[in-house]
Amino acid sequence: MTRKLKAAIIGSGNIGTDLMIKILRHGKNIEMGAMVGIDPHSDGLARASRMGVATTHEGVEGLTRMPGFAEIDFVFDATSAGAHVKNDAFLRSLKPGIRMIDLTPAAIGPYCIPVVNGDMHLDAPNVNMVTCGGQATIPMVAAVSRVAKVHYGEIIASIASKSAGPGTRANIDEFTETTSKAIEVVGGATKGKAIIIMNPAEPPLIMRDTVYTLSALADEAAIAASVEQMAAAVQSYVPGYRLKQQVQFDRIDTPIRIPGVGNALTGLKTSIFLEVEGAAHYLPAYAGNLDIMTSAGLRTAEHMAERMLATLAVAA
């Protein structure tokens, strides 16, 4: 039987519960060890118990008191940015080598977008999965950036209000700050900006994302091809990720001002329109924001675990 490494999930809300179901159904190198929450009556903890997963409603302290804590190699944190900083410090004081997959905007570890820089951080003790909007859009900024110098990248993530739990709502400022910075660090833009919209429409609308870049003039066909290749790469772990329409281009000949970038910018404006349909593992298919975040987190952990297991096999 193939050995798997055990993971705990902190946060029994929408993201944590969706991730748990993914691991139970599709985990290759990772298996569930514990589901951790703070509300004894949460649906996530109840569902975990029904699915045979060990649970605690006593937070990270409760996790460390569980009989199986010694076997936990990975911890996915789906709480909030502020809580993650404390969780990482507390758990690392007890298990210095534990791997943390940060699903909050805390970003105390390097930003990780699997299709862009995932292989760069396989040995990192803590990686940050940016945000749902970042996972959807930063690959597109990077796709333009590998063809032309991107001066400015702006993304707008529109998600169904019903898909946003209390953790997401409490982290709006952190969402915009972390995503904006990751557009620069991972996407390659000189300046990044992020906007999130929670759409209260009924019935809930599917996640949609818009990406605008202003770059140096370049071959439009090459940029379009790069975008399509990147979209296909994301689809390998988020099947519901797709381009909504063809990439659009506008040449900016009249100099424009972009604060923080320059006062006389010209070049090529690229507009990319995306749609992310969820796999409906927990919330319905409109919650593509959950799906892309948990899928990216699991993809990253799977690659880390594969590397760790290979090292153990060689040592044996």
Curated annotation (Swiss-Prot):
Catalytic activity: acetaldehyde + NAD(+) + CoA = acetyl-CoA + NADH + H(+)
Enzyme Commission no: 1.2.1.10
UniProt entry keywords in alphabetical sequence: Aromatic hydrocarbons catabolism, NAD, Oxidoreductase
InterPro entries reported in the protein's UniProt record: Acetaldehyde_dehydrogenase, Acetylaldehyde_DH_C, NAD(P)-bd_dom_sf, Semialdehyde_DH_NAD-bd
HAMAP family, alphabetized: Ac_ald_DH_ac (MF_01657)
Pfam families (alphabetical): AcetDehyd-dimer, Semialdhyde_dh
NCBIfam families: ac_ald_DH_ac, PRK08300.1
Active site as annotated: 132 (acyl-thioester intermediate)
Residues the record lists as binding NAD(+): 12-15, 163-171, 289
The protein's name in its UniProt record: Acetaldehyde dehydrogenase 3
Gene coding for it: mhpF
Family affiliation: Belongs to the acetaldehyde dehydrogenase family.
A single GO molecular function term of this UniProt record: acetaldehyde dehydrogenase (acetylating) activity
GO biological process: catabolic process
Lineage: Bacteria, Pseudomonadati, Pseudomonadota, Betaproteobacteria, Burkholderiales
